[in-house]
Amino acid sequence: MSQFINNPEHTFGFDTLQLHVGQESADPASDSRAVPIYQTTSYVFRNSQHAADRFGLADAGNIYGRLTNSTQGVFEDRIAALEGGVAGLAVASGAAAITYTLQALAQAGDHVVAQKTIYGGSYNLLEHTLSQFGVETTFVDAHNLDEVEGAIKDNTTVIYLETLGNPNSDIPNIDAISEVAKKHGLPVVVDNTFGTPYLFRPLEHGANIVVHSATKFIGGHGTSLGGVIVDGGNFDWKASGKYAQIAEPNPSYHGVSFAEAAGPTAFATYVRAILLRDEGACISPFNAWVLLQGTETLSLRVDRHVENTKKVVEFLIGDSHVAKVNHPSLPEHPDHELYQKYFPNGGASIFTFEIKGGQEAAWKFIDHLQVFSLLANVADVKSLVVHPATTTHSQLSAEELAEQNITPSTIRLSIGTENAEDIIWDLKQAFAALDE
């Protein structure tokens, strides 16, 4: 147990946890204070019994590089601590984290209830890819609790949400939905990529599992892919009888019951031992190390993102070229009350606005930006822009786009940490180009 977690003498703050958890003292092999990159594929066992104990989960430790790595382990422990979870699992990308989580919970013949206003890639995963494996999804208006509960079936096994919807930053009532889930014995999975554990911790509001694209705010610099699954350790996998793969003896791992063997970390252990083992979307030690560097400054960067976003939103609502700003800090936004509840210190530095003039004006505006980069990533220290309808959400049908409130006029901004005056100057000069 980390000396920085559940310390009886002192409660450590977020800024301290993001620097220390996972490596509380110097590296024992080298005395290095910085976390080393353990660039290896495999590990030597002391003897045959030691090897058998590792594979049998009787002895925690490294088995093979596809499953665990010491650099990766520090990263996993740190993100789990920041989210308030009991275990973390780092994988190759955010998409892998989401896919493995849903595969672990929804198998052939099962049903998922999902928020309809989510990242286009996650929508496609649920609507098209997982459906090929016999998993059905009902997409719901997460603001309508009756609709959420009405969508639950006898074979429903998970409710899937995003803290801040992509791209419009709409906010589900996670507390209320979690109560519905508990009533039906279902786990709630929340993608907290846009929320960040610094601003919001879903596990404190009833969620059971949190996923991240660590590529975004956690890494923060647009250099390295990675994803994280955080196990809240707060769901009873045996109670409902729906999760035999976790609760009952698993024939794929010589009859181990992960609920029995791993206790509160059963979910993370199952995903690592079965899905990561078999499907192999493991994170590289180098990427885990790079993402650790980002984690150490997460709170510092997010504060600047939030500060700049407030100034940009204020500018946009006063510009004549803008038809609407979709930011939950604004009183007219339908999720303003939830924003005030969940994000008292601000948030949602990734949001959209509607430009007057449709797609032609949107493209012209985007093409004249100089500080903003046109690319598909978000949550970078650099300011970013994209046209969702023709890029990130282009696989959606016209009807699906309408359900997600994405139009040809929608522009998504990801506000970086540059000087706010420079960001606003760039927006001004791109708007001016529309008048030429």
Question: Where are the model-predicted features located?
Answer:
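N-terminal "arm"/small-domain region of PLP-dependent enzymes with the aminotransferase-like
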Residues: 2-69, 77-78, 411
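Short amphipathic alpha-helical segments
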Residues: 60, 86, 287, 291, ...
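Conserved N-terminal alpha-helix of the aminotransferase class I/II PLP-enzyme fold
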Residues: 47-99, 121-128
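PLP-dependent enzyme catalytic core of the Aspartate aminotransferase-like
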Residues: 2-3, 86, 127, 136, ...
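Conserved C-terminal alpha-helix-loop-beta "cap" of PLP-dependent enzymes
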Residues: 280, 302, 310, 314-317, ...
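Conserved PLP-enzyme active-site core in the AAT-like
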Residues: 3-10, 22, 26, 89-318
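Active-site beta-loop-alpha junctions enriched in small/polar residues
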Residues: 164, 193-195, 330, 356, ...
